[in-house]
Regions:
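Conserved alpha/beta-hydrolase
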Residues: 51-76
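Alpha/beta-hydrolase active-site loop
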Residues: 46, 80-101
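The serine-hydrolase catalytic nucleophile loop
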Residues: 40-53
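Catalytic histidine-centered segment of alpha/beta-hydrolase-like enzymes
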Residues: 232-245
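Active-site glycine-rich loops that stabilize anionic/oxyanionic intermediates
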Residues: 31, 39-42, 204
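N-terminal cap/lid segment of alpha/beta-hydrolase-fold proteins
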Residues: 1-27
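Short beta-strand/loop motif that positions the catalytic acidic residue
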Residues: 194, 200-202, 206
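Hydrolase active-site cap/lid region
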Residues: 127-174
Length: 257
């Protein structure tokens, strides 16, 4: 059995809300912690399967809604103010909160992210490499800067010489600020500063983030295990998640480096 607890922390006056999952036990001492980051337009429940599995492994697992990053999220903020930089700031605030809890071990923190949350996780891990013990990325959206350069952010189509103030993407409108924050970025340079163990899992049939981005990321990292999930797209089915969690368990035990 595990317990659920709502938590909140703040960033620049905005409240970030999430859920903690951990074993309901009389465990002595501090436990390792895992922070999980959802993708563009998603919410904290997108990675719930993995949070519960991590809790069963003895982790205190934390899922949260990015500020302005999702339609059904509970955190403050507008999607028109959301950028990769604001999401990185959100994640850092959650990390600081988790590290400050009396029952978590700040020396054993795992970071997991999917899609845009994977890109953000990669950036934060590189900026705070000494704080992250292991990094797990599912189909990270390292294509975002290229999408900005071609006017196709979030599935939209716009003229890069006349960038609209509001970009109508699938699901969530974003602003010109988002475009401007990523258009000149090299995502592989942004993430390669993390030299700890990385597990990167990507679908062979991903039509949103081509698998070539995962292959390039694996080359950029110093210590990365890349797994291509045959037949999988952008997001995994329950059957595929069952396979993925086997790799996650192996990686956590230290055999997936």
């Amino acid at each position: 059995m595990f317990m659920e607890r709502e938590f909140c922390c703040t960033r620049d006056g905005l409240t970030i809300r999430g859920t903690e999952y951990r074993e309901d036990s009389e465990r002595q001492g501090r436990c390792p912690a895992a922070v999980l980051c959802h993708g563009f337009g998603g919410n904290r429940y997108d990675l719930l399967f993995y949070a519960k599995e991590l809790a069963a492994m003895g982790y205190a697992a934390y899922c949260f809604d990015f500020c302005g990053g999702c339609v059904a999220g509970k955190s403050d903020g507008s999607s028109l103010d959301m950028t990769i930089d604001t999401e990185a700031a959100d994640l850092k605030a959650v990390l600081d909160y988790v590290k400050g809890l009396p029952y978590t071990d700040e020396n054993h923190i795992l970071l997991m992210g999917g899609s845009q949350g994977g890109y953000v996780s990669g950036i934060v891990a590189a900026e705070r490499p000494d704080e992250i013990e292991r990094l797990i990325l599912f189909y990270p959206a390292l294509c975002i800067p290229d999408a900005a350069r071609t006017g196709t952010l979030g599935g939209a189509h716009y003229d890069v010489n006349r960038i609209p103030e509001v970009i109508r993407t699938f699901g969530v409108p974003i602003s010109k600020k988002f475009h401007d924050s990523v258009v000149d970025k090299d995502p592989f340079s942004q993430i390669c500063g993390y030299r700890g163990p990385v597990l990167l899992i990507h679908g062979s049939e991903d039509m949103i983030v081509n698998v070539s981005y995962a292959r390039q990321a694996a080359e950029a990292y110093e210590n990365c295990g890349l797994e291509i999930l045959q037949g999988a797209g952008h997001g995994f089915t329950q059957e595929q998640r069952e396979k993925v969690i086997v790799s996650v368990r192996r990686f956590i035990k230290g055999r997936g480096e």
